[in-house]
């Protein structure tokens, strides 16, 4: 059954993807990412502390790729409400999203500038952050870990894809002489 989500009235959503029990939405500017659903591995990308098992967010919330952790809300009485404050999002700092890919419990985002971000389930290297680390609760920029035998190279992500507990990315390089 299709259901209209009133939250999106007046917002022009142009990109969507869905993970195991959560959804991602990007507006036509490419700078506003919204997420809702289950988020106990940090896959909703908007909490400061690891949510309880089964944490579920019914209404979509904005997830900035670039944020100031100092401008966040600390709620000691209810840590589940600790989140990035939307008023502190600097729109000019937000990169334009080219692609969003939802794995089972983690997210990958590709920007038009060739950068990539990931967050969510971090075990077994699922987020591609270079090691088997804890869950990544907020968007974190991916840094390619590649070496060249000669010269200095710059890398650009071309495509990202999240799977069950793994990620794949297509990266191009340009050697600078």
Feature-to-residue mapping (PLM):
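Eukaryote-biased RCC1-like beta-propeller repeat architecture
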Residues: 1-177
């Amino acid at each position: 059954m299709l259901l209209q989500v009133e939250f999106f009235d007046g917002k022009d959503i142009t990109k969507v993807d869905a993970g195991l029990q959560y959804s991602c939405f990007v507006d036509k500017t490419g700078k506003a990412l919204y997420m809702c659903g289950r988020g106990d591995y940090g896959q909703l990308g908007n909490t400061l502390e690891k949510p309880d098992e089964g944490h579920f967010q019914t209404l979509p919330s904005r997830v900035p790729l670039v944020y100031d952790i100092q401008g966040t809300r600390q709620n000691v009485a209810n840590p589940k409400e600790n989140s990035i404050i939307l008023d502190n999002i600097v729109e000019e700092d937000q990169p334009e999203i080219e692609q969003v890919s939802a794995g089972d419990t983690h997210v990958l985002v590709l920007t038009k500038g060739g950068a990539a971000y990931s967050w969510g389930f971090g075990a077994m290297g699922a987020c591609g952050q270079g090691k088997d680390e804890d869950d990544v609760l907020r968007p974190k920029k991916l840094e390619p870990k590649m070496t060249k035998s000669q010269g200095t190279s710059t890398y650009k992500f071309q495509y990202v894809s999240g799977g069950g507990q793994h990620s794949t990315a297509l990266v191009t390089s340009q050697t600078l002489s």
